[in-house]
Regions:
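Membrane-active amphipathic alpha-helices enriched in small hydrophobic residues
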Residues: 1-5
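Catalytic toxin/effector domains delivered as secreted proteins or via bacterial secretion systems
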Residues: 7-136
Length: 136
């Protein structure tokens, strides 16, 4: 596991005090979620980036992550979601790639004034997605 953590650390480039995002990777996000102790569901699932790694509608939210030094593949930016409908109450992963989703994530994350608050908001979003209540 120490090697896995070291691999994650080397994926994040730092130049002085400027934080540079690594490239989004669902495989790396999955590994980071598992390393953080997040239980992998027993149904078909995807490691979902709460703040999308490349979608144009998520640019501002990505800037917020960068501002607070949170990598796009950090476990705090992830949640396991079903890839099949109606297996659990969680949000269906493919349905989340929408303008409405990106705007709501951005609105919520914009309230963060520091790294801890940003992580807390990401955890809140993850919980809502896992419970299927994000759009309620």
């Amino acid at each position: 596991k120490a090697d896995d953590v070291a691999d994650v650390a080397t994926d994040i480039a730092k130049h002085g005090d400027d934080f540079v995002q690594s490239l989004p990777s669902s495989k790396k996000l999955r590994r980071n979620l598992e390393l953080a102790g997040v239980e992998v569901p027993d149904y078909p699932n995807a490691a979902h980036h709460i703040v999308a790694g490349s979608a144009p509608g998520a640019e501002n939210a990505r800037e917020i992550l960068t501002k607070f030094g949170i990598d796009i593949n950090d476990s705090s930016n992830g949640v396991f979601l079903p890839t099949q409908r109606n297996v659990v109450n969680s949000a269906y992963h493919p349905s989340l790639h929408s303008t409405e989703y990106y705007e709501k994530v951005d609105d919520m994350l914009s309230a963060a004034t520091n790294r801890e608050e940003a992580i807390e908001i990401l955890h809140e979003i993850a919980d809502q997605l896992a419970e299927g209540t994000f759009f309620n």
